[in-house]
Curated annotation (Swiss-Prot):
InterPro entries: AB_hydrolase_fold
Cellular localisation: Lysosome
Main localization category: other
Documented EC number(s): 3.1.2.2
Disulfide bonds: C95-C103, C151-C162
Name assigned to this protein: Lysosomal thioesterase PPT2-B
Origin superkingdom: Eukaryota
Molecular-function GO terms, alphabetical: fatty acyl-CoA hydrolase activity; palmitoyl hydrolase activity; palmitoyl-(protein) hydrolase activity; thiolester hydrolase activity
Keywords, sorted A to Z: Disulfide bond, Glycoprotein, Hydrolase, Lysosome, Signal
Active site residues according to the UniProt entry: S97, D214, H269
Species of the source: Xenopus laevis
Family indicated by similarity: Belongs to the palmitoyl-protein thioesterase family.
Length: 288
């Protein structure tokens, strides 16, 4: 018995060292870069030593205005080997702001992905409408009336933000000219709609984080799959057509208890990836 007791510390050490965390892939937002995740990377390394972390260093700053589908396809080339190497263990995605929409595109177009948890950090998942700082930085010389005309013209519709600009008063124009979000939502059906939904449902867990003091995402409830109706009243996720008709799998995911939603007050948009409280309370637990 004494011999076993002497071996116990060694055995515990071996068990502790055998803990292996899933790789984490980070995708940044509009007019930003992988540097926006510097503090978040520190938080993850401290909480889960040994975690392999892959901040996507692509489409930085003004290049983030490139067409959304172009960003999805190029980033997919980068993360595919990471996902493949992870094997059955799987990976986690943390995707911030515009990056959350890019990650939706990745999930829907990768039939063999093994993403365990997708954490969407203050992302305009159901679109953007309103001249917040987010829009003003991207298109500083354009007001909201002009932006509606810019985004709903063939020449400009490939600008990233126009791909998910969603005017609640002009839904038909949104369907016609927004090159990204209607397809992502399967609001416009095509030969790949069924496959996009099937791919999205490979996801094990969806974590939605946003808050009322964001001041950039408009409406802020878009980070929770809510959006304006034609009266500019916010319609929550479960009352959205894409949820009720389960167009891309949102209702199915929710039905199996796979969606967690956090509404966090007091956090400005630029602070989400740098906020240690946000990490400790709403992110860390999902990165096992």
């Amino acid at each position: 018995m004494r011999g076993y007791l002497l071996l116990l510390p060694l055995l515990l050490c071996l068990v502790d060292n055998s803990v292996s965390y899933k790789p984490v892939i980070l995708v940044h937002g509009l007019l930003s870069s992988s540097k926006s995740f510097d503090k978040l990377i520190q938080f993850i390394k401290k909480a889960h030593p040994g975690t392999d972390i892959y901040p996507v260093d692509m489409f930085n700053h003004l290049k983030s205005l490139n067409p959304m589908w172009k960003q999805v396809y190029e980033i997919r080339k980068y993360i595919s080997p990471i996902i493949k190497n992870a094997g059955l263990k799987g990976v986690h995605l943390i995707c911030y702001s515009q990056g959350g929409l890019i990650c939706r595109g990745l999930l829907e177009t990768m039939p063999e992905h093994n993403v365990d948890t997708f954490i969407a950090l203050s992302s305009p998942l159901m679109g953007q409408y309103g001249m917040t700082l987010y829009v003003q930085k991207a298109l500083p010389l354009v007001n909201i009336s002009a932006l509606q005309e810019v985004c709903y013209r063939k020449f400009f519709k490939e600008i990233s933000i126009c791909g998910y600009w969603r005017d609640p008063h002009r839904y038909e124009k949104y369907l016609e000219y927004s090159a990204f979000l209607p397809k992502l939502n399967n609001e416009l059906l095509d030969s790949n709609s069924t496959e996009r939904k099937r791919n999205f449902l490979r996801l094990r867990k969806l974590v939605l984080i946003g808050g009322p003091d964001d001041e950039v995402i408009a409406p802020w409830q878009s980070s929770h799959f809510g959006f304006y109706n034609e009266k500019e009243e916010v319609v929550n996720m479960k009352d959205q057509m894409v949820y009720q008709k389960d167009t891309f799998g949102l209702q199915s995911l929710d039905g199996r208890g796979a969606i967690t939603i956090y509404s966090v007050p007091g956090v400005l948009h630029a602070s989400w990836p740098n906020n240690q409280t946000v990490f400790k309370n709403y992110i860390e637990k999902w990165l096992t």
